[in-house]
Amino acid sequence: MSEKKRKNYLLAALVFIPIYLFVIILTIHTMHIRMEMPYLDFFSAIREGALDIVRHPLRILPLAPGTGNAVLGVTLVIAASQAVLTIDAKLREHDDPDTVQGDARWLTELDDYNRRFTEPLGEASNDGQGNMIFSQDIYLSMEHPREVRRNLNALVIGGSGAGKSFNYVGPNLMQANCSFVVTDPSGGLLKSYGKFFERRGYKVKCLNLSHMERGNHYNPFRYIHSNKDVVTLVTTLVSNTTPPETKSSEPFWENSEKLLLIAIISYLFNYTEKECQNFSNVMRLLREAKINEFDAEKSTLDYIFEEVKALDPEGFAVKNYEEFKTGAAKTLQSILISVMVRLKAFDLEDVENLTDTDDIDLDMVGNEKTALFVILPTGEGPFNFLASMMYSQLFHRAYDYAENTAEFSQLVMDGGGQLVRCFRAETEEESGERKKEAETFLENARRAVIRHNETTGLYEAVTEDGELVCFRGTKKAARKALGSITDGGYVLANRERSNDGLRLPVHLRLLLDEFANIGKIPEFEKKVATVRKYEISVAIILQSLSQLQNMYEKNWSELAGNCDTTLYLGGGADTVTAKWISELLGKETRIVMNVSYGRGGGSTSLNRQGVELLAPAQLRVLPDDECIVIPKSLYAYKGKKYMTPDHPRWEEVKKSGPYYWSREKARYFDEAAHRGEPAEEEDPVPEEQTPGEEAVRAEQNREMRQKAQEYENNMDAEGNPLIDRPRPLGDAEGAHSGNLSADDHVHGTIREAADTFEKNEILWREMDVVYSSAPAESFSSSA
């Protein structure tokens, strides 16, 4: 029974019971009067009975003859009357006529909303820094998602020029309350807010796909930690390098390309050193996979995988390569050409330089306050698939860290509860060691000094050993930050925080502007549904709903449903989005006057009808400064957009000035992040050589150059083809101990090749070290 019905029944009982008791008492007194004055008629007896109640209220006993039958009869009459009234009420029962056609309305109780959903909770204001901003009046707490019972995902839709960056992304960036990964079309956001973040102690990084030389390096291989990661990487790559118009229901060609790519990437990951793991070497290996349907001779790539199979017959790379080779030669040749065309971007010098090394450090985005800007070319760029690969790996690494090892991390917090440094640990044993390191860091930080760094232009606090503690834009801000660490700093295990430590130390927020240009992220709809518990949130920012429907044709509604807040900034002539928003707003019941005219005159009538709160045509003419916010399980709000200059930190942003990315600054912060880690062994400095030794060295270089040319062209110095197989690298005197016969392996291990190349730096560059036929762990053990 509902609460409303319960209250109605209680009220009816409170009214009915006193009336019933009065009627029974009146009946008893009336029967006494009839016994004393039998000549009175029925109505006169009732009147005298009522007067007798006033004169003798307690004269009930003894009962007059026939009183029992009279009471029973009165009770039956009252019961029958009540039954008739109840049945009639049921027959007349109906819905509220003012809401029967729809009860939608606009959210107006802002004070109540702020108390429930914004920081500080319980107060009628929304001026806390731990809020997300949607409009001038609607905010949402990021610090207490469990209390507000909302996830922090948002779906933002607005046509070109509607203010997606200016009225939504910008104000939320100025909150500076978490780590941000921001899609930045044309780079305007980095220029406007980069220095603001830097002066507040953020690590500012940039993946620039428009001008690649003006950003950090991103090597996808760095974030591969298992063969499963290889499959995910290849799936993302193939999905986002296949033009939509060429996709068909026959997956044979794409699956075959995946087999070859998985085999090569798995080979590099499992059997070569870190320096060799990049897409430049993927392309080099592909060029070694020469296939001729009229010539059954094996290619260099075939020999490489034969060697790998001899060492690791059940290897993942071997299995995929053998499955690829089951096709006919002509088919394999077509597949190889398709793969080369698909990956042609990696032959460009800019892309090669971008992906050969990595300093973007995605693993640290959830460990320290970071602002990563992903700059995309205006419109659809040929390199945007790199962004989808990066986002896919970012999700995977964050999930893996939060689920498996984040609970072991030790955190150094300042007096305000803000994270200063995260010491990551993989196991319980390591957690104890990291705690000691964190305590040592905090102790050293208490003796830190403030200095101005000419490279970065920032004021930084450094320990006596030169370890970076924190940095800010001004000396005053740096002193304040250091003071908060020295006076109130403490060490905290991540597991002592919420969710048993299964969360990132710093909330990670992805503002995916121009979402349609990023490319398709594998299983993105599943990630959006589960990111909340890991301290991750996503804002999907689109120009129209059609973009989401085209990208995720089967799952777009699931994506939209997992965003607890929808923000509509206006869409012009976009009818698809307007109809969808109109349906979300719902209908309200309105009284409509109908007027009709005929020959005999006219008539009017009033009817209640369900009318859209805002029809699609009304949404099309929504004023430029207004927006609509649709929170989960609440009425929608229509009001003013948030104007960026109204933010209390806008003056700070303007004062900070424009940001220009600097290679020197990026290198400094990368070195500072890894300062204190065990250094890799450096190559010994060669002793000074005599002129005779230099001559021998020059001769060895000449011989090595000839051997390399033989290996490349598969022929000897006289131009005669090598019928069996190319001679092994490193056959020159002094390069290896002993001579290798023609029946030996095609080439030596990567360590042998590397040793040779290190001794001949004039001839070989470090990036030329490509091939290997031994597991990577064997190299580290022999080094």
Language-model features, listed with the residues they occupy:
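Local beta-strand/beta-hairpin segments that build beta-sheet-rich folds
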Residues: 468-470
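Short, surface-exposed polybasic-aromatic patches that bind anionic ligands, especially phosphate groups
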Residues: 643
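A short glycine-/small-residue-rich loop at the edge of a beta-strand within enzyme catalytic domains
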Residues: 119-122, 385, 515, 572
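Short alpha-helical interface patches
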Residues: 79-125, 227-237, 281-292, 362, ...
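P-loop NTPase motor domains
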Residues: 24, 150-444, 451-464, 476, ...
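Basic- and hydrophobic-enriched, low-structure N-terminal and domain-boundary segments
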Residues: 1-162, 166-171, 213, 426, ...
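Conserved small-residue-rich
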Residues: 139, 472-474
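Conserved ATP-driven motor cores of ASCE-family P-loop NTPases powering translocation/secretion/packaging/pilus
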Residues: 418, 528-530, 534-628
